[in-house]
UniProtKB/Swiss-Prot annotation:
This is Regulatory ATPase RavA. One of its GO terms (cellular component) is cytoplasm. GO terms for molecular function: ATP binding; ATP hydrolysis activity. NCBIfam families: PRK13531.1. Coiled coil: none annotated. The gene is ravA.
Length: 498
């Protein structure tokens, strides 16, 4: 693939030209363009009058000298109206059954069939062969047809368990369109003077027949990396577990892979990337219910697994758990231990401070911060005399939170290990230790693991940033993925500060 980034830029400019004068149809144009560039079919679902036919007409201008055919199906439509009339002369003179196909579907590169589900069996059967094999049986001859894009449209879905399902399954991309929603776009649409049938594409951007044929071969050379296949298989397994998931044929999966290859190719990449998998949201649904379900499952895949978000959070959880274990071990070693005094006749157990604690004011560190009296507290200052009296006689004990202000009443106790423990209103406790006896900062083991995890996170974020330049993926999906990665990064940084 020569100059992949130049090709990606050209396709982006081509799409922008095709989108001119069409409001809130950028995604539809881009996916129809991708379908045309990879030889696939598109189904547009939506009410009348929302530019479905105009989208198909625009795609003709993506190619030099492309021929277009469009037809509105009715229940009375005949094969002659779609595939061409019979040649009376050939039948009369030579007894040959032959159609005159000039100007009809068999000789068109871009085909638009409106109200597709109203077509009769004779049309549907011939259409299936045309889509599957790009061939048309004209009498005794089997002719290759040049169709690059079939756009079928309707305001309804095919009935379940009908003869239409075979044709519906051949339509790889399925788009559900609606009226223009944004107020500014609606106004622009009403006041636009642009002739919708004018060619908006500069000749320099149009695709030649030679380019198209060459690209078909190069699309097939785009690789599918193992980690991307694993994501696809994960999605397939998850869908198989869901009772309401739509049936997705092996044929549809295989055709979808070629679409992903085309997305990568026209984005300037040599391999399919996780970001390309977002296209599956427009390939795997069957009806309104499955549309929402597919989008939910792909959202989980993209925000939880595609860039190892869930895996990194699992690793972070294990690191945090290990840190807590080390903290507990350190707490047992460094906590201030008071001395238990004898006293057979005493109603209350008595204690005293260790002999090496001699300062008149003691500053004791909390092994973990607590919220006391609406303040985040990391250390408490005690008057030595007050603490000795409390250890000996009990009663009320007060200390200055973080060493400032007035001494506040505290819920202090001596645990079974003879450590001083302060508790908050929810009775969460924190062991007290003398300054210098508590470990400072993160243990080296934890620090190293967090640094490695942060390095892996940065690599994943860089990979995502490099893959974002994909014309065919909506920006809101990219935003959700970015948010999921930023959330993982924030949790890692928070753990590093503990």
């Amino acid at each position: 693939m020569a100059h992949p980034h130049l090709l990606a830029e050209r396709i982006s400019r081509l799409s922008s030209s095709l989108e001119k004068g069409l409001y809130e149809r950028s995604h539809a144009i881009r996916l129809c363009l991708l379908a045309a560039l990879s030889g696939e079919s598109v189904f547009l679902l939506g009410p009348p009058g929302i530019a479905k036919s105009l989208i198909a007409r625009r795609l003709k201008f993506a190619f030099q000298n492309a021929r277009a055919f469009e037809y509105l199906m009715t229940r009375f439509s005949t094969p002659e109206e779609v595939f061409g009339p019979l040649s009376i002369q050939a039948l009369k003179d030579e007894g040959r059954y032959e159609r005159l196909t000039s100007g009809y579907l068999p000789e068109a590169e871009i085909v638009f069939l409106d109200e597709i589900w109203k077509a009769g069996p004779a049309i549907l059967n011939t259409l299936l062969t045309a889509i599957n094999e790009r061939q048309f049986r004209n009498g005794a001859l089997v002719e290759k047809i040049p169709m690059r894009l079939l756009v079928a449209a309707s305001n309804e879905l095919p009935e379940a368990d009908s003869s239409l399902e075979a044709l519906y399954d051949r339509m790889l991309i399925r788009l559900w369109l609606d009226k223009v929603q944004d107020k500014a776009n609606f106004r622009s649409m009403l006041t636009s003077q642009q002739d919708e049938n004018d060619n908006p594409v500069p000749a320099s951007l149009q695709i030649t027949d030679e380019e198209y044929e060459r690209w078909q071969k190069e699309i097939g050379e785009i690789t599918l990396p193992d980690h991307v296949f694993e994501l696809i298989f994960m999605l397939r397994q998850q869908l198989d577990k869901l009772p309401d998931a739509p049936y997705v044929s092996d044929r549809r999966w295989k055709k979808a892979i070629r679409l992903l290859q085309a997305s990568a190719f026209f984005s300037g990449r040599s391999a399919v990337a996780p970001v390309d998998l977002i296209l599956l949201k427009d390939c795997l649904w069957y009806d309104a219910q499955s549309l929402n379900l597919i989008q939910q499952q792909i959202d989980v895949l993209m925000t939880g697994h595609a860039w190892q978000q869930q895996g990194m959070l699992t690793r972070l959880g294990a690191i945090v758990q290990r840190h807590l274990q080390l903290q507990q071990q350190q707490s047992d070693k460094t906590a201030l231990t008071v001395i238990r005094l004898g006293g057979i006749f005493s109603r209350r157990q008595q204690y005293q401070l260790p002999v090496n604690v001699t300062a008149s004011t003691l500053t004791l560190l909390l092994q973990k911060p607590l919220k006391l009296h609406d303040m985040e507290v990391v250390h408490i200052s005690f008057e030595r005399s007050a603490l000795e009296q409390w250890l000996s006689k009990g009663g009320e004990i007060r200390g200055k939170l973080n060493g400032i202000g007035f001494a506040q009443k505290l819920n202090l106790e001596v645990d079974s290990a003879q450590h001083l423990v302060v508790r908050d209103v929810s009775l969460q406790g924190s062991t007290l230790a003398l300054p210098g006896s508590s470990a400072e900062g993160l243990p080296s083991e934890i620090k190293q693991q967090l640094e490695e995890l942060e390095s892996d996170w940065r690599k994943q974020h860089v990979l995502f940033s490099e893959q974002q330049k994909c014309l065919f993926i909506p920006g809101d999906w990219l935003g959700r993925i970015e948010a999921s990665l930023q959330d993982v990064g924030a949790q890692i940084r928070q753990a590093q500060q503990c």
